[in-house]
């Protein structure tokens, strides 16, 4: 699923020029910033490595950026890979044996590591030792390699898919949450200065309100609206051109696009608001289940348009009102039951 409001990384995002390098430059996630600052200072004062850290939460909120910031703050090299890229134990061994003291190893989508790789990672995280088997059959022997003290930073959008043994080995688990409008305005204002965009306060607020609580989306929308302003002969990005551009991009006043409307209308039209299983929705919309669960549903849940229940997905009264559709009596009953049992 690829669209302007997808929180997933895109080749066109070009975040490097505006990516913050240190904690004091990072906007939002205040409690995480404050706690990380304490943990980093404490580790440096003891001349120790920072404990292994796990960032989890919806995509586009700054997990990769924070990992790079930690690397800068502790003065180590930054090595990056992803769960799907580590196919074999040998792949992991090659990465680990090339680390130096205080290096940061960042593994994105860490929930997608296979079991064999995970089991080799456990002693590397706990004891900084790599146990590998060399040879085959009767000639096989175990070799233990001592590793330098490094910090593993894992990132995942699906905490529930992480195995308990792996999750328990992270000393610093941190959940990243959606941004509010004021925080997104700060992100946009910082970026506008670095990108030399004349962004007014009203223009910033209009973009922020429709960015689904996600900095990556806000920055993407800012670039596209800058394009509309340039072609329209406007020197600044104000509320008027922001609203014009966002309408052209089919982003409504609360940040929904055509994919969100398809999702909500399917449940409303075909199941009177639900409940309906996610597999049924995915098949009907010709989308992957993972794409719906990671790209569409988190924001709909966050703003109160969708509920996940044991029986399936249920859209709320607020969703019917936003769709300008009458609320079926059955849907109203389900919504009340869900809240009473919660």
From Swiss-Prot:
GO terms for molecular function: ATP binding; ATP hydrolysis activity; four-way junction DNA binding; four-way junction helicase activity. One of its GO terms (biological process) is DNA recombination. Pfam families: AAA_lid_4, RuvB_C, RuvB_N. Residues 180-250 are annotated as: Small ATPAse domain (RuvB-S). One of its GO terms (cellular component) is Holliday junction resolvase complex. It catalyses: ATP + H2O = ADP + phosphate + H(+). ATP binds at residues 18-19, 60, 63-65, 126-128, 169, 179, 216. The RuvA-RuvB-RuvC complex processes Holliday junction (HJ) DNA during genetic recombination and DNA repair, while the RuvA-RuvB complex plays an important role in the rescue of blocked DNA replication forks via replication fork reversal (RFR). RuvA specifically binds to HJ cruciform DNA, conferring on it an open structure. The RuvB hexamer acts as an ATP-dependent pump, pulling dsDNA into and through the RuvAB complex. RuvB forms 2 homohexamers on either side of HJ DNA bound by 1 or 2 RuvA tetramers; 4 subunits per hexamer contact DNA at a time. This is Holliday junction branch migration complex subunit RuvB. It comes from Rickettsia peacockii (strain Rustic).
